[in-house]
Amino acid sequence: MEQIKSIYNKLFTKYDSYKRLDEISNVTIGKTPPRSEQSCFTVNKNDIKWVSISDLGKSGMFIFDTSEKLTREAIDKYNVKVIPKDTVILSFKLTVGRTAFTTENMTTNEAIAHFDLNNKKLNNYLYCTLTYFNYSYLGSTSSIATAINSKIVKSIKIGIPSEEQLNKFNNFTSAMFKSVKNNEFENIKLSQLRDILLPKLMNGEIDLDNIEI
């Protein structure tokens, strides 16, 4: 990630134009079905992952799993936006500025914005821009948590790189983004394997003396 940041900072030093986020993308917001209807929320891996700020805090650059899922019935009933794979998402309430890429079709709660870019080549650039952005500039009160809303998010202006700048950035970093994604996925799988094997080892179900390395 530091290497990507270094390339970003070297390439994007000045811009010919600035545009609002809602000028370069369709900005949508998530939703929470009524908590009184517990049947909406599940932990079934076959249901649609529902991203919270807490989930973003536990994820890296890419979000692979969520603590809760929504049923398809709940999504349809309450018109919850389903966002596609590789969408950049941003938290803008309570904890402002957490970012991630989705890794499959997902939903989020109302504290998270999604950016469906008009130009998909801007995707990695937008992720970096929102990750490095100083959100304190947006605050009109002492509490940034209460100062940000969806209207402010949509009105954020960012520099628009030239085609040459953008192509250079994508050429230099696309393999790095893929590597980060693969590494994060492998780390999750290793953690899951550890959680399965460690109790068996502690209970004596696995004998290390019989394992060949």
Predicted regions: what they are:
Residues 22-161:
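DNA target-recognition domains and sequence-specific DNA-contacting regions of bacterial/archaeal
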Residues 1-34, 47-50, 159, 163-208:
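Non-catalytic DNA-recognition/assembly elements of restriction-modification systems
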